[in-house]
From Swiss-Prot:
Pfam families in alphabetical order: PMM (PF03332)
Protein EC: 5.4.2.8
Chain segments annotated as transmembrane: none
List of residues binding alpha-D-mannose 1-phosphate: 25, 129, 140, 147, 185, 187
Annotated pathway: Nucleotide-sugar biosynthesis; GDP-alpha-D-mannose biosynthesis; alpha-D-mannose 1-phosphate from D-fructose 6-phosphate: step 2/2
One BP annotation, GO: GDP-mannose biosynthetic process from mannose
UniProt lineage: Eukaryota, Metazoa, Ecdysozoa, Arthropoda, Hexapoda
Organism for this UniProt entry: Drosophila melanogaster
Location within or outside the cell: Cytoplasm
Protein name: Phosphomannomutase
Assembly and interaction partners: Homodimer.
CDD domains: HAD_PMM (cd02585)
SUPFAM superfamilies in the cross-refs: HAD-like
Deletion phenotype: RNAi-mediated whole-body knockdown is lethal at larval stage with severe developmental delays. RNAi-mediated whole-body knockdown or combined neural and muscle knockdown, reduces N-linked protein glycosylation at the neuromuscular junction (NMJ) leading to NMJ synaptic overelaboration and decreased amplitude of evoked excitatory junction currents (EJCs). These structural and functional defects at the NMJ impair coordinated movement needed for viability.
Active site residues according to the UniProt entry: 16, 18
């Protein structure tokens, strides 16, 4: 049986946000929204799984209406689980690691960043979330132009890659995973708390015949890698919403 022949409740389509439903840190276009909600949603169960918190998902996907449009929303790699617009579960990194370890990590990162020489620095260098910490060497309060500039700088100088290497050495005694996502930051979370975490919730409550995942950061070290390479998913590497639309049109025969 082809994917297109499956009933809506037999297939789940899971999507990353940046580079998949939107361009990086941009808002979804009206054209893509129209295609997605009018043609894809009637054909398949739909969900989003992102590293960002729910508020950032609201910003990029045109507000709180996604609570009604998506069957599943998994912010913070699925450490927060939302079904039918209601939160049904949440995990907490402080309870898992302990306050002393979290404090030690944050203190080290702040010292490290204070001595790091990058072209610009702005504000919000560490963002604390339920299931992870997000570290941004230039600060998340940068403009879009500054974000793009750092992304190019990082390709050449590998700022994030080098910092992760140093953190792995310093915190070898702590069960932490480091994952580069987006243009300017990286996520830090306990082992196994990557995007595959959402599959635990899905498998515990549902029996889909196929689970498809769409994402862009699918290389080792990228924040889509674990779920992209998981045998439970049929995965599709994309780089833009146009790629996503093209593949959806093909597999659902729209």
């Amino acid at each position: 049986m082809t994917t297109a022949a499956l009933k809506r409740d037999e297939i789940l389509l899971l999507f990353d946000v940046d580079g998949t439903l939107t361009m990086p840190r941009s808002v979804v276009t009206p054209e893509f929204e129209e295609f997605f909600y009018s043609r894809v949603k009637p054909r398949a169960t739909i969900g989003i799984v992102g590293g960002s918190d729910l508020e950032k998902m609201f910003e990029q996907l045109n507000g709180r209406k996604i609570l009604n449009e998506f069957d599943f929303i998994f912010p913070e790699n699925g450490l927060v689980q939302i079904e039918g617009g209601k939160e049904v579960g949440k995990q907490n990194i402080i309870m898992h690691l302990g306050e002393e370890t979290v404090k030690r990590f944050i203190n080290f990162v702040l010292r490290y960043l204070s001595e790091l020489d990058v072209p610009i620095k702005r504000g919000t260098f560490i963002e604390f979330r339920n299931g992870m910490m997000n570290v941004c060497p230039i600060g998340r309060q940068c403009t879009r132009e500054e974000r793009n500039m750092f992304a190019e700088y990082d390709i050449e100088h590998k700022v994030r890659e080098k910092m992760i290497k140093d953190l792995k050495q310093e915190f070898a005694d702590v069960d932490l995973t480091y994952s580069i996502g987006g243009q300017i930051s990286f996520d830090v979370f306990p082992h196994g708390w990557d995007k595959t975490y959402c599959l635990r919730h899905i498998e515990a409550h549902y029996k889909f015949k196929e689970i498809h995942f769409f994402g862009d950061k699918t290389e080792p070290g990228g924040n889509d890698y674990e779920i992209y390479s998981d045998p439970r998913t049929i995965s599709h590497r994309v780089y833009t919403p146009k790629d996503t639309q093209r593949i959806l049109t093909e597999i659902l025969e729209l």
